[in-house]
């Protein structure tokens, strides 16, 4: 379970974040703070794994608060969600080692995607006693090999995302639904289905209907045999 603290002075935005987080498995909100002072008090009172931090708060800039958080709560990861677009804020955040930087307004899909990616990376780090270069490249998003030149792909299909879909299917011999694919790659079910259906159309994957006990049958996707 990933414990999240929300530091946001706009209560409406904080409520939106809270609602979206509650829709995701594996996350729990430990509390909300409306300013820097409340943020430090919240982190002192409750153990947090991840802090969603706004920059423009009433009593202090979020970026100015980060060194204090790093010193007092080194185990807390920080993700900035802000309307601040000045480059200097991003530079300060990067130097402080933040997990991500999101600019408001953030779409629900993007918000969920970033949290699921964080969850995946955290799980990967906690499950491996040692790291490899490929694992490091995956964590930092480097060393990506594109499966096809961008000009060969239709509109709405990105080569990097397509590669992630193929890798997910490659490691799932039992097949994956669009929802399961979306969770693995940190995207919506609609996006995952679009990419999976594209692979089916290129005969690089196949789809089969799986009938459950109740409800409508689901399409499961399998990587096509070489």
From Swiss-Prot:
Record keywords, A-Z: Activator, Cytoplasm, DNA-binding, Phosphoprotein, Transcription, Transcription regulation, Two-component regulatory system
Record carries keyword Oxidoreductase: no
Compartments where located: Cytoplasm
Alphabetized PROSITE patterns for the sequence: RESPONSE_REGULATORY (PS50110)
Top-rank lineage group of the source organism: Bacteria
InterPro entries for this protein: 2C-system_Tx_regulators, CheY-like_superfamily, DpiA-like_HTH, Sig_transdc_resp-reg_cit/mal, Sig_transdc_resp-reg_receiver
Domain (Response regulatory) ranges: 3-119
Encoding gene (name): citT
CDD domains with a match to the protein in the record: REC_citrate_TCS
DNA-binding region: 178-197
A Pfam family recorded for this sequence: Response_reg
Predominant cellular place of this UniProt entry's protein: cytoplasm
Name of protein: Transcriptional regulatory protein CitT
Source organism (scientific name): Bacillus subtilis (strain 168)
A GO molecular-function annotation: phosphorelay response regulator activity
Modified residues (4-aspartylphosphate): 54
Lineage of origin: Bacteria, Bacillati, Bacillota, Bacilli, Bacillales
GO cellular component: cytoplasm
Posttranslational modification: Phosphorylated by CitS.
Summary of the function given for this chain in its UniProt record: Member of the two-component regulatory system CitT/CitS. Regulates the expression of the citM-yflN operon. Phosphorylated CitT binds to the citM promoter to activate the transcription of the citM-yflN operon.
Signal peptide: none
